[in-house]
Amino acid sequence: MTPPAPAARRPSAALLWVLLAAMGAGPLFNYGVSASSTVVMDRLDVTSGQLGTVMTVVFAAAAVTSLGLGRAADRLSARAQLSIIFGGTAAALVLGAVAPSLPVLYAAAAVAGVTQAISNPTTNRIIRTVVPPERRIGWVGVKQSGVQAAQLVGGLFFPAASLALGWTGAALGAAVLIGALWVLALVAAPPLPGAPPPATGPVGGRRRRDTSPLPATVWFFAAIAFLTGLGMQATNTYLPLFAVETLGMTLVAGGAAAAVSGVVGVLSRIGWSRRMSSGDRPTTLLAVICLGAVAGVAVFLAADLLDLPALLWVGAAVHGLTVLGANVVINAGLLSEVPAERLGRATGANSMGMYAGFALGPLLMGLLRDVTGDYRAGFAVVAAGYLLALGVVLLLRRHVGRRGVDA
């Protein structure tokens, strides 16, 4: 069992910043490719649909490795896991920077996916181990906002840097930043030990692996993460291209719209975590998020159908306010449902669902864009995913109601 932190030791603010950076490191690759989309497409001579497959590779790699890395998060030291996150992201950015073809960019994307697969198990385990119970949900909200902080940095830095320095220069610059954060993480984070070995069996001291089933609630959360993740990442990936190709805006403006979504997402994730801390039920918050996300899709479609580019900014803000907060509520729900020694495995299962949605969303959006010539069908699929997620939320509410649990 993962030992609790000594009562006398309180986690430092530096550790919170390390967790935020750990959540944002891997996604910086994703947002860099998305925000530099037209530059990358010209460099590699690919279509927008083909560019979307890069994100599919990222999240397919994350989905495939999530369960195994979730188990690893229950055993490895925190510093070892932080090295996987920051070192792997830096390697992915360097490889992507020099990629001469789409297959090489796929290889970089796979590395980035692995680093992202362990980020939630790592940060959840650290919070459960060293943070007092009354502060955990607040910490989850802050560390989850690291993803949107990466969206903000990527949306502002990559378009301007790629236009000035090319994709190679922009990606290498980001790799230097991640390398510096890696060093700071190892210095600032306290030396957290790895979890003790699994219990041994009666014969020969062999390790006994925990194969007990996870609570059904974990799988409900994983399904919600899959459906909201599908729409979230489809929108994140194609928002800059939607701005350029459909609304006639510049790449810098498209990146700025993604940055707006990221800024609002940072604030919304902290806000949703505060609602959880104040006692709101996860299912109530998730239902509001799903309905709000559908409204955001409607705004994007209105911007297209009415030819009103100004609505892009409204849609980006609604996107950040709603669906970008889903993972905070889901992760906070997991913290309350799963004991510390199994939290890595539970988070890995949830991450598998989320990253499967992340992989499928950009793929569908890109394919539908190439087939139909616009983004309307893709956004319709995104809205359908949010409505299905709402249905799963209602099923979860019914399930926990039968158990007498306030969730």
Residues covered by each model-derived region:
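A late C-terminal transmembrane helix in Major Facilitator Superfamily
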Residues: E337-T372
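Conserved MFS/SLC helix-loop-helix module at the cytosolic interface between two early adjacent transmembrane helices
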Residues: V64-P100
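C-terminal transmembrane helical hairpin of 12-TM major facilitator-type secondary transporters
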Residues: P282-I330
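Cytoplasmic helix-loop-helix junction between adjacent transmembrane helices
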Residues: A108-V147
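Helix-to-loop junctions at the C-terminal end of transmembrane segments
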Residues: T65-S77, S268-R281
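Helix-loop-helix hairpin linking two adjacent transmembrane segments in secondary transporters
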Residues: V142-P190
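Extracytoplasmic gate region of multi-pass secondary transporters
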Residues: V33-S34, T217-A259, V266
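Cytoplasmic membrane-interface "Motif A"-like loop-to-helix N-cap segments
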Residues: R75-F86, S277-L291
